[in-house]
């Protein structure tokens, strides 16, 4: 049979409360700590429909009332065949028809930058701000690469506000008309929201 000597008794009396305290502390810590994130079912705007928008974007760089202005450039931008490094800010009308006098349904606001050294390719960061019709007050956010010399192009819709909150989709821009350096671009936009 195991016997506890007189010397071992004080040691055990000190060790047992220490073990008990450690176990208790660990139990309290585990039960009181919370995870850094929590996933809950979203009860808000659930995706339920696909909307097709058709409009024209007026990119006016020349003249007295430009809608697009170059705000920055790299040292070699002007000698680059693709104006690589140019950054332009945009606040352009979005209309129902291809003529600037057509009914304005919104604005294209954002920027684009020449980001391709070999061909005309722009990285576009736009918000289509709708000011008329069913989606008045809503925006759709577009972000992507636009190789403007290609006839078929596709850019992602990555979100929005209002009716387009949590939206996703794509835009199909097609150059409708170019006069000097100004352009009218037809957009077919498909948004799941």
UniProtKB/Swiss-Prot annotation:
Keyword Glycoprotein: yes
Predominant location: secreted
Disulfide-bond pairs as recorded: none
A Pfam family hit: Dirigent
Keyword ATP-binding among UniProt keywords: no
Glycosylated residues in this chain: 78, 136
Subunit structure: Homodimer.
Descriptive protein name: Dirigent protein 11
Originating species: Arabidopsis thaliana (Mouse-ear cress)
Phylogenetic lineage: Eukaryota, Viridiplantae, Streptophyta, Embryophyta, Tracheophyta
